[in-house]
Amino acid sequence: MARTIALWAGPRNGSTALMYSFAQRPDTRVLDEPLFAHFLRHTGVARPSRDEVLSAMSSSKPDALATLVPAPSDEVLFLKHMANHIEGLDWKDLDGPKHRHVILTRHPDGVLPSFRAHIDHPTLLDLGYVHQHRILKLAGERAAVITAESLFANPTGTLRALCDALDLPWQTEMLTWQKGGILEDGVWAKYWYDGVHNSTGWEARTLQHGNTPPHLSELRDQCLEHYLALEQHALKT
């Protein structure tokens, strides 16, 4: 039976680059946000790619959940999710005996300025910190937490630690990829993936924090409470 690794990320966390890392592994098949259409239909939220996503993917709950089932040929199935895509779904349908969960989170002072370039008025629902905290409580010891700050500052060390936590052999191929994109990219890639498409792999760097506008300070503080709780469980590298 195939193993499933479910990544639960927030926006602007580096989740696409992490998906690209796992896509380089010969033992792994990746899926890009298979629950996105269901999330859009269930919540009604606006996204730049909303119409394209709903045209390209089924938004029904049964169809969305069916995509999460490993194929007979799969050894490892890596599911890249946004954490808020659990909206309207039962945890029992997103977990199983062969599941491991990865929570990728980032300080809100790094997320909010970047996310506002795409979504003018972000909400707690958009940013996913509450969902990540909930997932950690539900998954317990089968969840590994990593921060975007650690992943970008020390990609080799963080990816090695993550592989160890997931009981996967380390593969150096995870550090590089071809410039351009991968076949598994969702139809929303043109709106969000420019940085990854113009890269050829991980380069250690420090993620910068921006200035959160005063009118978002309350939202920032709400997110920070959950981020700090998640950070306490982050893998050491």
What residue spans do the PLM features occupy?
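A structural signal for well-ordered alpha-helical scaffolds and beta->alpha junctions
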Residues: 15, 58-62, 75, 125, ...
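Generic structural signal for helix capping and beta-alpha/helix-loop junctions
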Residues: 38-40, 111, 180
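Short, basic, helix/turn surface patches
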Residues: 56-64, 133-136, 197-205
